[in-house]
From Swiss-Prot:
Major localization listed first in the record, in broad terms: cytoplasm
Name of the protein described by the UniProt record: Triosephosphate isomerase
Cross-referenced HAMAP family: TIM_B
Catalytically driven reaction(s): D-glyceraldehyde 3-phosphate = dihydroxyacetone phosphate
Highest rank taxon of the organism: Bacteria
InterPro entries linked: Aldolase_TIM (IPR013785), TIM_sf (IPR035990), TrioseP_Isoase_bac/euk (IPR022896), Triosephosphate_isomerase (IPR000652), Triosephosphate_isomerase_AS (IPR020861)
Assembly behavior: Homodimer.
Length: 251
């Protein structure tokens, strides 16, 4: 059985003081991690206090990006090795904002996935199509190509442990949500792609999230779908009550 995973992606929000307040507000009210895994991915400047404040609670921690080199003359980057030393569990890579604003390529994302695994951090690999790709009805081939490129050279064992987040770019921060059926259809396509690349067992183990205007009002319906194992949540993860409503969707 795949354990559901709800991960908040704070993007460029929250300072260390706000992070401490947020974690203190949620940490006693999170579900048992065997029922639902609760994750907050925060800006690098907040990670130390996020981890420290979350200690002893059911809150898992994530970074929003990392580089594929562990150290050296790479001004402004985040080391996957240091994330591991800090005890950070997850790292989001390949988010559409990173691909769009910062021109990250599929090759960069593949290198990052390998670097994270080499340093004991679990990647959350994002994929998803733009509005024009969907309107041209090319979303399947687009996302399949992203998955193939991102997973290139990873072992079946690695892939069964990572998380894939499907985030249709047209539904991020636009208030438009893919219908639960549209989301399920793409998450199923992703699972079938993993099966084609590896095997059925790997495809059954990999957790696939939907990301794109996930909120308390639609989380139950999305999570009822067989191939959706979680949510990668933006705005709705910034408020403690809203985040708690998401992770406790089973109640």
């Amino acid at each position: 059985m795949r354990t559901p995973i709800i991960a908040g992606n704070w993007k460029l929000h929250m300072n260390p003081e706000q992070t401490i307040e947020f974690v203190n507000a949620v940490k006693g009210k999170l579900p048992d991690p065997s029922k639902v895994e609760s994750v907050i991915a925060a800006p690098a400047v907040d990670l130390y206090v996020l981890k420290k404040t979350a200690e002893g609670s059911n809150l898992h921690t994530g970074a929003e990006n990392a580089y594929f080199e562990v150290e050296g003359a790479f001004t402004g980057e985040t080391s996957p090795k240091v994330l591991n030393e800090m005890g950070i569990d997850y790292c989001i890579i390949g988010h559409s904002e990173r691909r769009g604003y910062f021109h990250e390529t599929d090759e960069d994302i593949n290198k990052k996935a390998k670097a994270l695994f080499a340093n004991g951090v679990t990647p959350i690999i994002c994929c998803g199509e733009s509005l024009e790709t969907r309107e041209a009805n090319k979303q399947d081939e687009w996302v399949v190509a992203q998955i193939k490129a991102a997973l290139d050279g990873l072992t079946a064992e690695q892939v069964s442990k990572l998380v894939i987040a499907y985030e249709p770019i047209w539904a991020i921060g636009t208030g438009k949500t893919a219908s639960a059926d549209q989301a399920e259809e793409m998450c199923k396509t992703i699972r079938e792609t993993v099966k084609d690349l590896y095997n059925e067992e790997t495809a059954e183990n990999v957790r696939i999230q939907y990301g794109g205007s996930v909120k308390p009002a639609n989380v139950k319906e999305l999570m009822s779908k067989p191939d959706i194992d979680g949510g990668l949540v933006g705005g709705a993860s910034l408020d403690p009550e809203s985040f708690l409503a998401l992770v406790n969707y089973q109640d």
